[in-house]
């Protein structure tokens, strides 16, 4: 085999190995991004449920506060009469 043939073969093997390694690294990176996306979605769903629960509590507390204010206004109104 001539020297130039050996060089071309060596470069071809090197380029092929680099391409295969690059593809594997990119696949691993893509898989990790997919896993991270799923984890973020689950965390987002948990936060959404928590926010809905807190909103429900706030609505109940607001209704209780408004009822107490109404009672106080009625009590003050009956005292003035």
UniProtKB/Swiss-Prot annotation:
One matching Pfam family: PET117
Main location: mitochondrion
The organelle targeting sequence, given as a residue range: 1-22
Protein name: Protein PET117 homolog, mitochondrial
PANTHER family found in the cross-reference section: PROTEIN PET117 HOMOLOG, MITOCHONDRIAL
Localization per record: Mitochondrion
Annotated disorder: Mitochondrial complex IV deficiency, nuclear type 19: An autosomal recessive mitochondrial disorder with onset in infancy or early childhood. MC4DN19 is characterized by global developmental delay, impaired intellectual development, developmental regression, loss of acquired motor and language skills, and motor dysfunction. Patient tissues show decreased levels and activity of mitochondrial respiratory complex IV.
One Gene Ontology CC term in the entry: mitochondrion
InterPro entries recorded: Pet117
Family from the record: Belongs to the PET117 family.
Segment forming the signal sequence: none
Gene Ontology biological process: mitochondrial cytochrome c oxidase assembly
Keywords: Disease variant, Mitochondrion, Primary mitochondrial disease, Transit peptide
Taxonomy of the source species: Eukaryota, Metazoa, Chordata, Craniata, Vertebrata
